[in-house]
């Protein structure tokens, strides 16, 4: 494995597809179990909080609390699916299975591998988010066409959290460290981004912090789409998600290059 192969830049514009395809072939053998695993937690939130708090809260922003929550759970499902794929699964392919090492002996470069891992994580995020959306549409909390319109944003959400997850993978010495990321980063993001309750109900300091969280931008796009409301500040939200995709991508590849060349 040479230093040239462990470069931060992709070797070709479509080389990442080989990585995506490899992961897809390995995943499809256990696809149903994987999908059900990613759907379980958001569905528990949807039905548990929706049935419990929905009675007490009533309506939020002119819609039922369950409809409000459903849109948040679509974005949350994309976040958790992409995060799991790029920390636990990608770390396993890098360290335990040594799959990355084998790939780097081919024409693939490190940038291709990272990009392929991110694309695969975004694919799983889109499937997970769409799965929650299908349940919401079947129960009448959104329109089927609205769910279709939300799919690009769901995938973009997956890419953003996949990119962040790759940074964590690059830094983590072992699997044990991922619990800190999930507990100290992902869980606060869930509760501060407006997935479960409106951001404007939070103290001002948390409202300010929420503006910088990727899930907030995702929800601000997905929720109005699913509820049939006008979407405002589209360029701002999409631009913020793109920043969360691009900057961590280059950071993770640089960190991984240093790690793999030790």
Swiss-Prot record:
UniProt GO MF annotations: ABC-type transporter activity
PROSITE patterns, A to Z: ABC_TM2
Primary localisation category: membrane
One example of a Gene Ontology biological process annotation: oligosaccharide transport
GO CC, any one term: ATP-binding cassette (ABC) transporter complex
ABC transmembrane type-2 domain segment(s): 33-259
Domain of life (superkingdom): Bacteria
Pfam families in the cross-refs: ABC2_membrane (PF01061)
InterPro entries: ABC2_TM (IPR013525), ABC2_TM_bact-type (IPR047817), ABC_2_transport (IPR000412), ABC_transptNodJ (IPR005981), Nod_factor_ABC_transporter (IPR051784)
PANTHER family referenced in this protein's UniProt entry, alphabetically: NODULATION PROTEIN J
NCBIfam families assigned: nodJ
The protein's assembly and partners: The complex is composed of two ATP-binding proteins (NodI) and two transmembrane proteins (NodJ).
Function: Part of the ABC transporter complex NodIJ involved in the export of the nodulation factors (Nod factors), the bacterial signal molecules that induce symbiosis and subsequent nodulation induction. Nod factors are LCO (lipo-chitin oligosaccharide), a modified beta-1,4-linked N-acetylglucosamine oligosaccharide. This subunit encodes the transporter.
Protein name: Nodulation protein J
């Amino acid at each position: 494995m040479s230093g040239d192969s462990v470069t931060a830049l992709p070797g070709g514009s479509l080389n990442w597809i080989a990585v995506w395809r490899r992961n897809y072939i390995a995943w499809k053998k256990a696809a149903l179990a994987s999908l059900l695993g990613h759907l379980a937690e958001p569905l528990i939130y949807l039905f548990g909080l929706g049935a419990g708090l929905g009675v007490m809260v009533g309506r939020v922003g002119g819609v039922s609390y369950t409809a409000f929550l459903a849109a948040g759970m679509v974005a949350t499902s994309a976040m958790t699916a992409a995060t799991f794929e790029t920390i636990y699964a990608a770390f396993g392919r890098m360290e335990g299975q040594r799959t990355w090492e084998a790939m780097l002996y081919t024409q693939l470069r490190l940038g291709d591998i990272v990009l392929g891992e991110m694309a695969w994580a975004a694919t799983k995020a889109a499937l997970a988010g769409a799965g929650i959306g299908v349940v919401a549409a079947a129960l009448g909390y959104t329109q089927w066409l609205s769910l279709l319109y939300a799919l690009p944003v769901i995938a973009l959400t997956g890419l953003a959290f996949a990119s962040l997850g790759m940074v964590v993978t690059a830094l983590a010495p072992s699997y044990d460290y991922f619990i800190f990321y999930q507990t100290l980063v992902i869980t606060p993001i869930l509760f501060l981004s407006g997935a479960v309750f409106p951001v404007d109900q939070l103290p001002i300091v948390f409202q300010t912090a929420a503006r910088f969280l990727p899930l907030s931008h995702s929800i601000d796009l997905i929720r109005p789409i699913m509820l049939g409301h006008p979407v405002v500040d589209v360029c701002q939200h999409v631009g913020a998600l793109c920043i969360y995709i691009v900057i961590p991508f280059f950071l993770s590849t640089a960190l991984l290059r240093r790690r793999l060349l030790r």
